[in-house]
């Protein structure tokens, strides 16, 4: 069984009009949509912030307001959702950063037994999305902590970073992860 974890592929990150747009990320939805049929399970992780989130500059954090719950910026690309619907895979959503007082870059900090079982039953866990130097990289580290290192494949051409990509490359190299 193969699982793809699509990290924070939300309009505020991939759309040039988004508040935290990552250069070049507008090409990711079509690339990821083309890959979706290869996988049995699709996990979307979502930044899912309240307006008073601690990470926002107006509240003492470092980021502009982004990915507000139920907003345009928090939404997923239609073409990826259509690909999932057409392929009829098992789909799951993981909301993070949804408590105003807590920053949460990585997915699976609050993993359920069912989520962990699904991941452990996967022969391959492909990881892609935004941003490699924050949420993608820390999600990979969390998957490693959960004992899933040998199953991880980083989809580099579907992953963008705020930095020059060196943080994610360091995580890949340090952990000898597979890439595609």
Which residues are covered by each model-predicted region?
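Short acidic, glycine/proline-rich loop/turn micro-motifs
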Residues: 15-19
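Polar, low-complexity loop segments and adjacent catalytic/binding residues used for recognizing
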Residues: 54-66
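Active-site-adjacent betaalpha module
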Residues: 2-5, 10-14, 24-41, 50, ...
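Short, well-structured hydrophobic secondary-structure segments
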Residues: 43-45
């Amino acid at each position: 069984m193969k699982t793809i974890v699509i990290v924070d592929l939300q309009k505020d990150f991939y759309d040039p009009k988004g508040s935290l747009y990552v250069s070049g990320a507008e090409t990711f939805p079509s690339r990821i949509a083309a890959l979706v049929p290869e996988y049995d399970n699709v996990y979307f992780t979502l930044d899912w912030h309240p307006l008073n989130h601690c990470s926002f500059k107006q509240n003492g954090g470092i980021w502009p307001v982004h990915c507000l719950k139920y907003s345009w910026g928090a939404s997923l690309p239609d073409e990826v959702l259509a690909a999932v619907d057409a392929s009829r895979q098992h789909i799951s959503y993981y909301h993070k950063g949804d408590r105003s007082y807590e920053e949460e870059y990585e997915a699976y900090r609050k993993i359920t037994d069912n989520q962990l079982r699904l991941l452990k039953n996967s022969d391959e866990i492909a990881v892609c999305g935004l941003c490699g130097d924050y949420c993608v990289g820390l999600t990979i580290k969390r998957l490693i902590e959960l004992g899933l290192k040998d199953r991880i494949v980083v989809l580099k051409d579907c992953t963008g970073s705020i930095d020059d990509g060196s943080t994610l490359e360091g995580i890949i190299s340090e952990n000898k992860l597979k890439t595609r």
